[in-house]
Amino acid sequence: LQGPKAQAILEKLTKASPSEVPRFGCVETEVDGINCLVSRTGYTGEDGFEIFCDAADAVNLWRELLKRGAELGIEPCGLGARDTLRLEAGLLLYGQDMDESVTPLECGLAWTVDFGSDRPFVGRVALERQLEAGSPRQLVGLKLLEPGVLRAHQRVQTAHGEGQVTSGTFSPTLEVAIGLARVPAPVVLGQNVTVQLRGREASARVVRPRFVRHGRALA
């Protein structure tokens, strides 16, 4: 249940106070009389909630959410819509924007590694070496400057070598094609690059890999 009206809709079905659930927090409560774990999390870049319940209760709960949320404009959506939202928000997809061959330093997730702790962990030595020497590649955002749609695996040509689009789509919010790409580290924000787009070359601009948050354009 995601979006600016998620809280108001959830309040219709539970005695708990959704506004008091902190971001990334959770609470055990009843939703429409069904025992649930409700977390203030999501994969859309919007405020919202994820509701966990027994599989046997899921269909009835889904239908009740749609029924009670109708007057507030609730709409069901699928993975395609969610993927567009997460890409607009710059949220990575494992197996596409990152995998076991990509370090956190190469995909904008260095903040998840606690280098300040003395605690050993698998890969620490290698990451510390990369941190000191500098990562040879980085994850950036792209905005296409001409008609077309960015898609995964398209080749990106920069002044410092080649890269590759990892995720791409058309952004309904920005009304332009956007994507995430892994490119050489020397590439900087604002530079133009060339993307191989279905047999032709198209220009794109390098931007921060976060395009939209809470419905507001960032790039």
Please give the residue ranges for each predicted region.
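Conserved, structured C-terminal
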Residues: 1-219
